[in-house]
């Protein structure tokens, strides 16, 4: 039944607070309606002035990191499924064919646009720290932080997985097919086998070389099929996972809660409790997990409205911070081949990361100055720090309106993860980023899937060197800060594009450069995705194979410090609507994905 909701006319479609609305200078009027809730932790929703469904001529599209996952989504769309139905299918297959990046043992963030009503809502399936978690659980006996390789393999790194419950919540509201239907492609593929891809083969080999697989996962991923296996399954070999099929069949038959009780839950708890460094995750923690349906964070950028995730993801805030800083410069006149264009993008990233590192965490438990961080006047003051000819020598966090005193946290997130976009025949859109965090997560393989190591996204230290409390410190029931940035963009009340990426901390930079490429530099989605990946959080990590060496040398002359990179794990996927109502898709050439349309 369609929800009846009231209307409220404001300057932009949504704001966290009145100060954010007042600060938005984009010359675009929007219509906002508060969206009512239907269970779960609902905060609100943006509502875009919806275009009538009859104006939608684009068919549908799936853009994801693996062809098998794309085909699963297309199968569900052809069967009359919604964007959310297809998202369930895509995620289920990604957990099988790309287990190093995401899966049902991890978490996700999903941004959804309902073309019929104009609702823009987000779903938070982030992992939660168990009740036994402590602020010092990633410190050794001397009080020093554990090294990341030690922490990531520990049971302490495993958070309560959220992706299955989140998909269940989204499906209850936006699913069109029975819950059991979207799981079928993954179940079939797990039972029959799928061909090992070059990327999966390479990453199994890399993990084996670093001795980074625990026995059960090693047995599954190696030719020998033993706990001491040493040979990755070769490219093209058929890999079956009947245990995963049984797990998915249970979820498909009994609903999302089947994952959080009974045999699956017991396997998860046993996996987290195993050595090395057993964790405290319990059956009670799993039973208590609830996803959240939250308002997006949205702001104007030139003639566009950009919407993303709110905390515990820092992605939405940081992407809007980058764009809000760049809005004070004529980026379109600079272009993607200019020194000035990259210089301003670097500086805006540096400013956004400094604020993000200091202030953003799980805002259920920590005060986060959401409105202040994206306030137009504040970002104008940050933009004033940018010189047209010299890189800033030092970048410190600013003092946005409402900011508390915090210690800086430079926690690094490993570039794992996966992102996909689905658009269905009615124009509904899903932009979803999903992860087990590091490659193969915590390396604990249970019930046919890998458990996450998401709790290593917390700061390992509860206070900084000055004794200031760190916002992203560990606490029981808390969600670790994320950089995941599933994003939707609108123009004149109509859906314009969806984009997102994996990449750890660098996700923010990848998404921002792609948005600038399309919105400022006039590039197609594929051209924008293909732009060099650059991450300016400390020394600028630049994808040297894709950027003009002369531009790099000129930027060095301005004071920028560089470190060579190879893309650093991006997997950008985007879909855009053209002026005549057709879909343009993009898949990151750095991975194995594709974007395919349904006529």
Residue locations for each model-derived region?
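Bacterial N-terminal signal peptides that target proteins for export
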Residues: 1-12
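Active-site rim segments in enzyme catalytic domains, especially the processed small/beta chain
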Residues: 96-100, 107-113, 117-122, 279-282, ...
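Short beta-strand scaffold segments in enzyme catalytic cores
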Residues: 102, 107-114, 418-422, 486-488, ...
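Extended C-terminal subregions enriched in glycine
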Residues: 426, 477-479, 511, 520-567
């Amino acid at each position: 039944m369609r929800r009846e909701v009231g209307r409220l006319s404001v300057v932009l479609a949504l704001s966290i607070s009145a100060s954010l609305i007042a600060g938005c200078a984009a010359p675009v009027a929007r219509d906002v309606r508060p969206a009512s809730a239907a269970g779960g932790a609902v905060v609100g929703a943006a509502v875009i002035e919806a275009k009538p469904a009859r104006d939608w001529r684009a068919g549908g599209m799936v853009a994801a990191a693996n062809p098998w996952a794309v085909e699963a989504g297309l199968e569900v769309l052809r069967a009359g499924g919604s964007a959310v139905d297809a998202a369930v299918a895509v995620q289920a297959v990604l957990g099988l064919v790309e287990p190093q990046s995401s899966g049902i043992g991890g978490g996700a963030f999903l941004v959804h646009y309902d073309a019929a009503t104009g609702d823009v809502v987000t779903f938070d399936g982030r992992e939660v720290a168990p009740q036994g978690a402590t602020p010092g659980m990633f410190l050794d006996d001397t009080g020093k932080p554990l090294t990341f390789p030690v922490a990531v393999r520990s049971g302490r790194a495993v958070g309560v997985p959220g992706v299955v419950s989140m998909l269940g919540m989204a499906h209850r509201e936006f699913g069109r097919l029975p819950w059991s239907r979207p799981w079928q492609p993954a179940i079939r593929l797990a039972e029959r086998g799928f061909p090992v891809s070059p990327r999966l083969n390479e990453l199994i080999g890399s993990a084996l070389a670093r001795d980074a697989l625990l026995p059960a996962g090693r047995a599954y991923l190696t030719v020998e099929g033993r706990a001491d296996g040493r040979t990755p399954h070769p490219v093209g070999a058929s890999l079956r996972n009947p245990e995963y099929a049984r797990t998915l069949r249970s979820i498909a038959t009994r609903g999302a809660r089947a994952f959080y009780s009974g045999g699956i839950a017991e396997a998860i708890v046993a996996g987290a409790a195993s050595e090395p460094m057993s964790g405290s995750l319990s059956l009670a923690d799993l039973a208590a997990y609830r996803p959240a349906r939250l308002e997006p964070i949205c702001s104007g950028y030139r003639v566009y409205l950009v919407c993303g995730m709110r905390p515990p993801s820092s992605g939405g805030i940081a992407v809007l911070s980058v764009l809000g800083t760049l809005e004070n410069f004529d980026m379109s006149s600079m272009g993607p081949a200019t020194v000035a264009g990259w210089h301003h993008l670097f500086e805006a990233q540096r400013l956004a990361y400094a604020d993000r590192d200091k202030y953003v965490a799980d805002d259920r438990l920590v005060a986060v100055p959401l409105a202040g961080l994206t306030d137009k006047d504040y970002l104008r003051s940050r933009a004033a720090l940018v010189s047209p000819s010299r890189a800033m020598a030092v970048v410190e966090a600013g003092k946005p309106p409402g900011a508390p005193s915090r210690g800086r946290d430079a926690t690094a997130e490993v570039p794992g993860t996966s992102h996909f976009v689905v658009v269905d025949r009615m124009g509904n859109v899903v932009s979803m980023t999903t992860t087990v965090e590091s490659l193969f997560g915590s390396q604990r393989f249970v019930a046919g899937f890998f458990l996450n190591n998401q709790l290593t996204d917390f700061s390992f230290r509860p206070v900084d060197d000055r004794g200031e409390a760190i916002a992203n410190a560990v606490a029981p029931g808390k969600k670790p800060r994320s950089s995941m940035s599933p994003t939707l963009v609108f123009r004149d009340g109509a859906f314009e594009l969806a984009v997102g990426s994996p990449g750890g901390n660098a996700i923010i930079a990848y998404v921002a450069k792609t948005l600038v490429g399309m919105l400022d530099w006039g590039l197609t989605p594929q051209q924008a995705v293909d732009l060099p990946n650059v991450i300016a959080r400390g020394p600028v990590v630049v994808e040297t194979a894709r950027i003009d060496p002369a531009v790099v040398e000129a930027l060095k002359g301005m004071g920028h410090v560089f470190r060579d990179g190879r893309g650093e794990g991006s997997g950008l996927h985007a879909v855009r609507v053209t002026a005549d109502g057709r879909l343009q898709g993009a898949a990151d050439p750095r991975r194995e994905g594709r974007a395919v349309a349904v006529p």
